[in-house]
Amino acid sequence: MNSDLLTKPVMEAFRAYTAGVRWVWLDLDDTLIDFRANSIAALYATYSCCQLDRYFDSCDEWVDSYLRHNHALWDLYNRAEITQAYLRMHRFLDPVREKCPGISEESFTDEANRLDKVYLDLLAQQKCMVDGAVELVKHLRAHSYNIGVLSNGFTDVQHRKLHAVGLDKLVDAVVLSDDIGVNKPDPRIYRHAMERSGDTDPARHIMIGDNPSTDIAGALASGWRAVLYDPAVTQAVLTAGGLAVPSLRLLPSLFQGI
């Protein structure tokens, strides 16, 4: 452990903060799985598989445009302002229509569906993990914590991602917004997770995630403890909003078992 990143007072305060925690819930994309790296690899492969040079001058142009539109659409989706079907159509349609304004949604539906399937199939095969993620999950398992995955991702790909990296054998529960119809940070998904776990005491649950607006805000509003994984912070810090850490590798020393 690097004492410059995780001081003894923070360790002691965090252990008091998490006393009684039995369930550790982890976000999947960009917390356990390196979604950005995997997504970019899948997008490059999609460009070749689907001959997207029909629309874009280069693969980099396609990837940059997709990422920009997808990010904006996910913000809307997380706020329940658009449907999943709209997101999955427009993250492909909008980049293409930016290059070819005459393309209509109706004429592009079949192409968007094909792109969606190809991209998600390729994405599910990628295996890049966030540094320290596997070690954290194995540590939690060895120290008798129950482990859950709580994700806003799509059912038809999240389980395949877990299987591809071998995490499906290490977690006790997987709760997906897609399955219950509400996204983080809606408290109902956290309530559902507690009911699924069989332990409805919020103080016995903690959320580890990379998104303060969804993972952390929802957990805190539901009475859970929370850990924000944020590589931009310079050292671990514990506030009223939970713990923030720059690396998952700091967490095993904080979770010492039940």
What kind of feature is each model-predicted range?
Residues 71-118:
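A metal-dependent, Asp-based hydrolase signature
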Residues 43, 63-66, 89, 190, ...:
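A general structural signal for well-ordered alpha-helical segments in protein cores
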Residues 51-55, 98-107, 166-170, 198-199:
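Short helix-capping segments at alpha-helix termini
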Residues 39-40, 56-60, 84-85, 105-109, ...:
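Alpha-helix N-cap/helix-initiation sites
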Residues 14, 20, 85-86, 108-113, ...:
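Short, acidic loop-to-helix structural element flanking the phosphoryl-transfer center
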Residues 39-47, 66-70, 92, 96, ...:
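Hydrophobic alpha-helical core bundles mediating ligand binding, dimerization, or RNAP-core interactions
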Residues 1-24, 37, 134, 138-141, ...:
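Asp-based, Mg2+/Mn2+-dependent phosphohydrolase catalytic module
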Residues 4-68:
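Active-site neighborhood of HAD-like aspartate-dependent phosphohydrolases
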